Swiss-Prot record:
Keyword DNA-binding in annotation: no
Provenance organism: Pasteurella multocida (strain Pm70)
Note on how the cofactor is bound: Binds 2 Zn(2+) or Co(2+) ions per subunit.
Binding site for Zn(2+) 2: 100, 135, 349
Signal peptide limits: none
EC top class named in words: hydrolase
UniProt name for this protein: Succinyl-diaminopimelate desuccinylase
NCBIfam families named in the record: dapE_proteo, PRK13009.1
GO terms under biological process: diaminopimelate biosynthetic process; L-arginine biosynthetic process; lysine biosynthetic process via diaminopimelate
Entry similarity comment: Belongs to the peptidase M20A family. DapE subfamily.
Protein purpose: Catalyzes the hydrolysis of N-succinyl-L,L-diaminopimelic acid (SDAP), forming succinate and LL-2,6-diaminopimelate (DAP), an intermediate involved in the bacterial biosynthesis of lysine and meso-diaminopimelic acid, an essential component of bacterial cell walls.
Keywords: Amino-acid biosynthesis, Cobalt, Diaminopimelate biosynthesis, Hydrolase, Lysine biosynthesis, Metal-binding, Zinc
Catalytic reaction(s) noted: N-succinyl-(2S,6S)-2,6-diaminopimelate + H2O = (2S,6S)-2,6-diaminopimelate + succinate
Gene Ontology molecular function: acetylornithine deacetylase activity; cobalt ion binding; succinyl-diaminopimelate desuccinylase activity; zinc ion binding
Amino acid sequence: MKNSIIELARELIRRPSISPDDQGCQQIIAERLERLGFQIEWLPFNDTLNLWAKHGSGSPVIAFAGHTDVVPVGDTTQWQYPPFSAQLVDNVLYGRGAADMKGSLAAMVVAAEHYVKANPEHSGTVALLITSDEEAAAKDGTVRVVETLMARGEPIDYCIVGEPSSAQQFGDIVKNGRRGSITANLYIQGIQGHVAYPHLAQNPVHKALGFLTELTTYQWDNGNDFFPPTSLQIANIQAGTGSNNVIPGELYVQFNLRYCTEVTDDIIKKKVAEMLAKHQLNYRIEWHLSGKPFLTAKGKLVDTLLDVVEKITQNRPHLDTGGGTSDARFIALMGAEVVEFGPLNKTIHKVDECVNVDDLAKCGEVYQHVLCNMLERV
């Protein structure tokens, strides 16, 4: 299994699939799966390519989800090796996407291949959902596939998203949820004027100070057993013309909340509106909801994955909901039990992104054993 995973991972890394350009990665995967009897369905939306592949029929539907797109490489002269050369040095595979997430994608594919070869008449459905739009807009990828499946009443019961979840050593963390993410673009209106004549103007920066203080010090909740407290950060702020003698006519503030299951996006919007009204601000606000929080508590998938990882690594992982958003938030909308599990995330999006190939081999073992155990237990 190890050599097959390494070979496929290197083949995928050599394709410069900057989001949302798949660069033929999914075609490589589809051809492999089709030879084993997987049904291949292409679900393209705009410039994004999506693959929905499945083997078997009926329930339970156990899916692996991942993405072929990667982030830009930046200054290539800073890399030890060309970022799309897939160099293997001292058991470490280098390249953009090695950890996020072409390595675990290769492990998924090979694990599914091994399982289907050994169990051609298995019960239930083994599926793979692969997109080329995760790292950028994430508008035409997994979310559109999920919408398509839900519209035709096609379920996913369990799903492992192959994001690099491990922190210090392989298998130490299983992500069983994520916080929600909502961003506000706030425009506070004033009256532009000369700084020497403040009585003829209205400075929106001065007017907003009380509101901004309340906004940044407000305690939304105390978190819970699964999530830390909701947090708010101002990401961007802008006012003025650049001149030192002009009172600005508008203040722009962009802030983001990473919120837990103790609040909702509606509660957040309502509270912010109350604060703005309290401070008597003339404003316009635009909200963008990136994803609602989700949580997969104890269940067959979580229990099975924890047991399998412990058996393979000799260490029991712990559950965690930290970090940013992922495509798991879309799959959770189907009512599926969803977790994220993959290799170390220490080098993702960095120069010299890399992954230990022994970890990839273990990752493939985990995925295959989960299939065996889940389909036997259901």
